[in-house]
């Protein structure tokens, strides 16, 4: 009998002890400094959290050292080569995009990273920031969505725009998607031009220049993007293009970006072209040389270094390259590599290299 009493007492003691331990169970199992849901509610952080990922995803760059290759396969080895902006000098790439033999892994990267990394955050921002409750964040979400996905549509044509992540999602034609771009931009413009203040986006904004992280500046960006897209469809839908261009340029809608100090970029994020240039895999394309030199574009000296005649990429005197003498003197000239040139990579050592290593990422409105 005594044994039973003692056993019962021990069990009750254990239960009481366990109960006292679990009184603070949530505290014991939390991490000091964790960004909890409760903390995210302060200063509207719950609503703002998705925007960092979205802004970094337009010109894809996570900002972490060692991730430049993602930008390279999304943008530099695809659109930049195909459009004649740059040419790589990696000899192993000569059988791929720079000679018009498209690499499926590179050409699919834009879709994979946008829909795997950026679109979930856009969907979160759409769900969190309704027009009624959070009009400013709602408008900026729409602008960023268009800024992100117009680039994807220009790669692939039909894309997933509406209904992402739902059971009935389906691709929409490029014609339909462009109409949706204009609808969303019009909604954003109407919200922003009538916005009377309240919440701020400044703490989450790293696309507008410091001192201009305001709804008025986002309004200008929306109009500039609207004008850009109108120009894109001018040859296939001239009436739509005219309507949208006039709306974008209507002073009553807030104006467009016009001055150098209004440059839209990704401020504070390392330019991935600097990393790619460090691998000696991005040189000026001859097509870009033709435009920049032909129009005496003042940006030429900021974008590229002049060629070095008779020197290899390490600066050593090298009058013969791969056993072949230099055909002409191009020292101190700005020379690009002709698209489709499939020669040994050390033949490119004299051409103009990019100088973008210390410049913030180019503004989304100027990217192909």
Outline where the language-model segments fall.
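Generic low-complexity segments that are intrinsically disordered, proline-rich and/or Lys/Arg-biased
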Residues: 1, 365-368
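Bacterial Sec-dependent N-terminal signal peptides
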Residues: 1-30
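Generic alpha-helical segment signature
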Residues: 7, 47, 115-118
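Intrinsically disordered, low-complexity Ser/Thr/Pro-rich tracts
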Residues: 8, 18, 150, 367-368
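Membrane-proximal, proline-rich intrinsically disordered regions
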Residues: 21-83
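Structured, solvent-exposed acidic/aromatic patches
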Residues: 88-358, 362, 366
